[in-house]
Regions:
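Short amphipathic alpha-helical segments
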Residues: 15-42, 74-82
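Short acidic, gly/pro-rich beta-turn/loop elements at beta-sheet edges
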Residues: 18-20, 67-69, 101-102
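A periodicity- and composition-biased signal for non-globular, repetitive helical segments
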Residues: 11-12, 88
Length: 102
């Protein structure tokens, strides 16, 4: 089974903006109700421990349909909210090649 990963790294100009966006992002993900992909996608939202102005959103999806649906939703819902804050963004799309647990 293919596992797709998307890592979004956002760096804001203040911790307050970062905290505000994290809260808004949590609420947007909780409110998103795309039943056709609900079991195919998840997100981990993290605040950087060393830089309080930086956060990550790590999306895991089981197929391209889930990523496509998320892309459409993100473009219409998430990005307009994020773009009201001054920020830098790095986005990495990847396919999981190994998972090691010890």
């Amino acid at each position: 089974m293919t596992v797709l990963k998307r890592l979004n790294i956002n760096k804001f100009t203040s911790e307050a903006d970062n905290d505000a966006f994290i809260e808004e992002l949590k609420q947007m993900w909780l409110a998103w109700n795309e039943t056709s992909i609900a079991t195919k996608i998840s997100v981990d939202i993290n605040k950087d421990r060393n830089d309080p102005t930086r956060m990550t959103a790590f999306v895991t999806a089981s197929d391209d349909d889930a990523i496509s649906a998320m892309n459409k939703w993100s473009k219409n819902v998430v990005m307009p909210v994020r773009d009201k804050y001054q920020h830098e963004n790095i986005m990495i799309d990847a396919e999981l090649v190994a998972s090691v647990s010890k």
